[in-house]
Amino acid sequence: MTPDGCPVELYGLLPAAGEPELVHRSIPAGASVLDLGCGTGRIAAPLAALGHEVVAVDESAEMLALVHDARPVRAHIQDLRLPTTFDAVLLASHLLNSPGADDRQALLATCRAHVSAGGQVLIQWHPAQWFDALRAGTTHEGELGPVRARLAVHAIDAGLLDAEVSYRAGDQQWVQPFFARRLDEQQLGEELAAAGLRFGSWLDTGHGWFSATPV
């Protein structure tokens, strides 16, 4: 288990699901990339194979031990301050929907501190419409490679989702609590501005990814 309760075995099974290609086509060829919260490198390694120099950051030594073809850095994202900047900073895994405002600002501050003057931050999030489609007491299932995932919604109160996520792969199963904050586009813009960033553009049709640039 990682410090935040993530099962390393599970994350080692999860394949990339189009994220490396989305990032690759959104940034210049050969652009340097800082992957924040890289996990086992399921995005970092394919980006390296596509010609990018990638620095992969995670707080878990166990996760980083599975990272290949990228330079691993063990650190809490919120505390990270490297002596260099990058053409692209990647904040995936819906970390922007963290429940606490202080956590979100700390994540964005790290993004801002490491993006070059002409670079961009690429962020994956759950948009407001994703939350609006959920109802307390419902379950939602899907597959990620060999892993079957199930989201059980307990409650949505004042924009805070209280849920449980379970994963199954073969005869193995992992269960985790899941909390996420709903942000609308106005709130998103305000949080970006507070961190010295400006909304750029949507990177996919479902508005699950967007770019931001330094102010």
Q: What does each model-found stretch correspond to?
A:
Residues 41-79:
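Class I SAM-dependent methyltransferase SAM/SAH-binding core
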Residues 1-39:
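Conserved class I S-adenosyl-L-methionine
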Residues 105-117:
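A short glycine-rich, Lys/Arg-flanked "PGG" loop and its adjoining helix->strand segment in the class I
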